[in-house]
Amino acid sequence: ASQKRPSQRHGSKYLASASTMDHARHGFLPRHRDTGILDSLGRFFGGDRGVPKRGSGKDGHHAARTTHYGSLPQKSRDGRPQDENPVVHFFKINVTPRTPPPSQGKGRGLSLSRFSWGAEGQKPGFGYGARASDYKSTHKGLKGVHDAQGTLSRIFKLGGRDSRSGSPMARR
């Protein structure tokens, strides 16, 4: 947008805002709308589509649309903490119910701490490249959940086998 300004002084604001809005709306939202995280991210980039879900009513809807065009970059940067919350939420929802029963307490503590570290590692990806990496990160995240399941079960088998001779950590 800033490059266009000197040469196309006239309609530059409209041109830039319309094009960015179109990209945000058509490029990002419809394709991944079903994922849930991206819905919440879509609130920041698509403005009108995600806001009504928020329950903020028409005022929020208009505010999002009006401030949306000029402050697209700042919005994504300032919104990073909020962007991360749905991601962490997503990991919590998808991963915690799958943790095995408390009977394997030893293994569970180990894997949970390990997994929370994994979730932490995901955060920067979502925060920094929010728009570009939405699609890839989400799928990576989903794959990560399955991988984690595999590693979790592996850790649990380890934990179960080694419980006689101390925890897996002690053995290493």
UniProtKB/Swiss-Prot annotation:
Protein name: Myelin basic protein
Chain residue ranges for the region called Disordered: 1-21, 45-116
Modification Phosphoserine, positions: 7, 12, 19, 40, 56, 76, 116, 163, 167
Topological type in the membrane: Peripheral membrane protein
Reported modifications of this chain: At least 5 charge isomers; C1 (the most cationic and least modified form), C2, C3, C4 and C8; are produced as a result of optional post-translational modifications, such as phosphorylation and methylation. The C-terminal arginine is partially cleaved in C2. One or both of the C-terminal arginines are partially cleaved in C3. The two C-terminal arginines are partially cleaved in C4.
Residues the record lists as Omega-N-methylarginine modifications: 43, 49, 108
Residue ranges, compositional bias (Basic residues): 1-12
Sorted UniProt keywords: Acetylation, Cell membrane, Membrane, Methylation, Phosphoprotein
GO molecular function: structural constituent of myelin sheath
Lineage summary: Eukaryota, Metazoa, Chordata, Craniata, Vertebrata
Source organism, top-level taxon: Eukaryota
Residues found modified as Phosphothreonine: 20, 35, 67, 96, 99
Assembly information from the UniProt record: Homodimer.
Cell membrane is among the record's keywords: yes
Cleavage (site feature) positions: 91-92, 115-116
Residues found modified as Symmetric dimethylarginine: 108
Disulfide bond entries: none
